[in-house]
Amino acid sequence: MAGEIFTTAFLCFSLILVGIGLGYLLLKVAPD
């Protein structure tokens, strides 16, 4: 089913966005 492929791709994309967001927040909050 294409639905499973779409769901998997969406989850992977969401995880990547969350990772980038967390990394950006850490860099922004860090005193460095």
UniProtKB/Swiss-Prot annotation:
GO terms for biological process: photosynthesis. The chain crosses the membrane at residues 9-27. One of its GO terms (molecular function) is electron transfer activity. Its main location: membrane. The keyword Manganese does not apply. Keywords: Electron transport, Membrane, Photosynthesis, Thylakoid, Transmembrane, Transmembrane helix, Transport. It is found in: Cellular thylakoid membrane. The keyword Membrane applies. GO terms for cellular component: cytochrome b6f complex; plasma membrane-derived thylakoid membrane. It is a single-pass membrane protein. Pfam families: PetM. Belongs to the PetM family. Component of the cytochrome b6-f complex, which mediates electron transfer between photosystem II (PSII) and photosystem I (PSI), cyclic electron flow around PSI, and state transitions. The 4 large subunits of the cytochrome b6-f complex are cytochrome b6, subunit IV (17 kDa polypeptide, PetD), cytochrome f and the Rieske protein, while the 4 small subunits are PetG, PetL, PetM and PetN. The complex functions as a dimer. This is Cytochrome b6-f complex subunit 7. It comes from Acaryochloris marina (strain MBIC 11017).
